[in-house]
């Protein structure tokens, strides 16, 4: 348990940041899931639209420090290649 005033404030800030980060992480997962489902259904147009929506969300999470920048880039790259494969 925090004893000093500054430690109590730090605890409050951490709790607030954790909630925000959790929300962002969940949001990213939902967008990625929509792309995965569209790929699984085989609908190229739907998958491309879902990827277009997921891409900025992943970049935003990376810029906010929720996920590592390389992780975001890797996920986008792999999803994009799978969406592109649907068109072939």
UniProtKB/Swiss-Prot annotation:
Keywords: Ribonucleoprotein, Ribosomal protein, RNA-binding, rRNA-binding. It holds the Pfam family Ribosomal_S20p. It comes from the Bacteria. One of its GO terms (biological process) is translation. Belongs to the bacterial ribosomal protein bS20 family. GO terms for molecular function: small ribosomal subunit rRNA binding; structural constituent of ribosome. GO terms for cellular component: cytosol; small ribosomal subunit. The lineage of its organism: Bacteria, Pseudomonadati, Pseudomonadota, Alphaproteobacteria, Hyphomicrobiales. The keyword rRNA-binding applies. Binds directly to 16S ribosomal RNA. This is Small ribosomal subunit protein bS20. InterPro entries: Ribosomal_bS20 (IPR002583), Ribosomal_bS20_sf (IPR036510). The keyword rRNA-binding applies.
